[in-house]
Curated annotation (Swiss-Prot):
PANTHER family: ATP SYNTHASE (PTHR15184), ATP SYNTHASE SUBUNIT BETA, MITOCHONDRIAL (PTHR15184:SF71). GO terms for molecular function: ATP binding; ATP hydrolysis activity; proton-transporting ATP synthase activity, rotational mechanism; proton-transporting ATPase activity, rotational mechanism. HAMAP family: ATP_synth_beta_bact (MF_01347). GO terms for cellular component: plasma membrane; proton-transporting ATP synthase complex. ATP binds at residues 154-161. Gene3D superfamilies: 2.40.10.170, Bovine Mitochondrial F1-atpase, Atp Synthase Beta Chain, Chain D, domain 3, P-loop containing nucleotide triphosphate hydrolases. The gene is atpD1. F-type ATPases have 2 components, CF(1) - the catalytic core - and CF(0) - the membrane proton channel. CF(1) has five subunits: alpha(3), beta(3), gamma(1), delta(1), epsilon(1). CF(0) has four main subunits: a(1), b(1), b'(1) and c(9-12). This is ATP synthase subunit beta 1. Its main location: membrane. Belongs to the ATPase alpha/beta chains family.
Length: 480
């Protein structure tokens, strides 16, 4: 629980956007204390700085319209708190823990400070275990870690949110734990659609949703991640459950911190980011960990400005992750969904000691084939496929079939694609890739491997297409 102080009253002395300065003649509010101000005490301010013996500076978590100098400010004496407990399941919250799903107030909860400490090293688990997603290209080439952190890196419109929601669907439907979705600075529409989709899928009972949308002040977007994390820690530490924490988008968290930094007068660092970017990100990321009794597995979408992976936001986020999934605009443009770039993505879980010799050797061979194909593309574009050696032509065929086999119809896009979603066990993925590399599908059309689940579907697809072609060819001339 956060430390509580006696309530004190002060006055507002300055307002600059979301930054509010206040004067307290008696006891100064401590850092992270919540102060209420406004005509009806409707504006919530979190204290970030003590300027001198009588003045403090804070960031408003709500809009400051109507706030004037000289208005009273009341120190609540406590930090920002979040509701924790089983009563939060199936509900949707804002940064303050208020329910925003129009289903009435939340019951059966207690309130905890959002400013917690990471688990001690002695409490952390060192066991490495793969977290299966049911998505072929991820499970084979970029396996995720149970209790680890994975990032989905990509620019605008390459499928980060779709991939994130597909993982929610696959994991919630087969895992016994709790999923918490945290929307930081994203579109209101996406949150509403996710809530409706999860409700229709029947998995909402084991989910909690927390949103700080893009139209909200930077203070709200900056703290909503801590609200969601506090809820996740309750399920991990108190109920000893497995928790899946999905964050969309961690870049918006950094962006909100940058806005706040500029408004409170800190000197900007490279590309205008706040000088404290590393500290702020670590305060969030280090609390995401697995202990001996429970685990928080986190998957985070990371927007990459202008597809520049040297951007400080992307660089600082990379250092906290056990797996990095890079989404390629080129692959998305070619229709390969999910648009995961197999050569740029990586995971520390892909080692032989973790996934086993068969999986490890296959993943290396798949990467080798795809890498050689990437090198040959320029030659093919200039001289044509016929100018390659017979061995290189066979390698190109394998690579093209692998690329198509790694595409997959998603449950969350059924209404758009018209294709039934597929979740594929890792054993089926390994079997399919091995058979492709053995050239068992050399005589199959490449389209037979596109947007399927297991490899057996390619055979069924080809049989159906062949039967239809034969029936059309056998149709008598002039027949109906």
């Amino acid at each position: 629980m956060g430390k509580t102080e006696p309530e004190q009253t002060g006055i507002v002395t300055s307002i600059r956007g979301s930054v509010v300065d206040m004067r307290f003649d008696e006891l100064l509010p401590s850092i992270y204390s919540v102060v209420k101000t406004g005509r009806e005490m409707e504006v919530t301010v979190e204290i970030l700085m003590q300027l001198d013996r009588r003045h403090v500076r804070g960031i408003a978590l709500t809009p400051t319209e109507g706030l004037c100098r000289g208005m009273k400010a009341r120190n609540t004496g406590s930090p920002l708190k979040a509701p924790v407990g089983k009563g939060t399941l199936s509900r949707m919250f804002d940064v303050f823990g208020n329910a925003i799903d129009r289903r009435g107030p939340v019951t059966n909860v207690t309130w905890r400070s959002v400013h917690g400490a990471p688990p001690q090293l002695s409490r952390r688990s060192t066991k490495s275990e793969v977290f299966e997603t049911g998505i072929k290209i991820i499970d084979l080439l970029v396996p995720l870690e149970r209790g680890g952190k994975a990032g989905l890196f990509g620019g605008a419109g390459v499928g980060k949110t779709v991939l994130l929601t597909e993982m929610i669907h696959n994991m919630v439907s087969k895992e016994s734990g709790v999923s918490i979705f945290c929307g930081i600075g994203e579109r209101c529409r996406e949150g509403e659609e996710l809530y409706r989709d999860m409700s229709e899928a029947g998995v909402l009972d084991n989910m909690v949703m927390v949103f700080g949308q893009m139209n909200e002040p930077p203070g709200s977007r900056f703290r909503v991640g801590l609200t969601a994390l506090t809820m996740a820690e309750y399920f991990r530490d108190d109920l000893h459950q497995e928790v899946l924490l999905l964050i969309d988008n961690i870049f918006r968290f950094i962006q909100a911190g940058s806005e706040i930094s500029g408004m409170i007068g800190q000197m900007p660092s490279r590309l205008g980011y706040q000088p404290t970017i590393g500290t702020e990100l670590s305060a969030l990321e280090e609390r995401i960990a697995n202990t001996g009794t429970g685990a928080i597995t986190s998957i985070q979408a990371v927007y990459v400005p202008a597809d520049d992976f040297t951007d400080p936001a992307a660089v600082h986020t990379f250092s906290h992750l056990s797996a990095s999934l890079v989404l390629s605009r080129k692959r998305a443009g070619e229709g390969f969904y999910p648009a995961v770039d197999p050569l740029s993505s990586g995971s520390k879980m892909a080692g032989e000691s973790i996934v086993g010799r068969r999986h490890y050797d296959l993943a290396r061979e798949v990467r080798r084939v795809l890498a050689q194909y990437a090198e040959l593309k320029d030659i093919i574009a200039m001289l044509g496929l016929e100018q390659l050696s017979a061995e290189d032509r066979r390698l190109v065929g394998r690579a093209r079939r692998l690329e198509r086999f790694f595409t997959q119809p998603f449950f969350t896009t059924e209404q758009f694609s018209g294709l039934a979603g597929k979740s594929v066990p890792i054993a089926n993925t390994i079997d399919g890739c091995e058979r492709i590399l053995r050239d068992e599908f050399e005589n199959y059309p490449e389209r037979a491997l596109y947007m399927i689940g297991s490899i057996a579907e390619a055979q069924e697809k080809t049989v159906i297409e062949t039967t239809m072609s034969e029936s059309v060819a056998a149709k008598p001339e002039g027949g109906n």
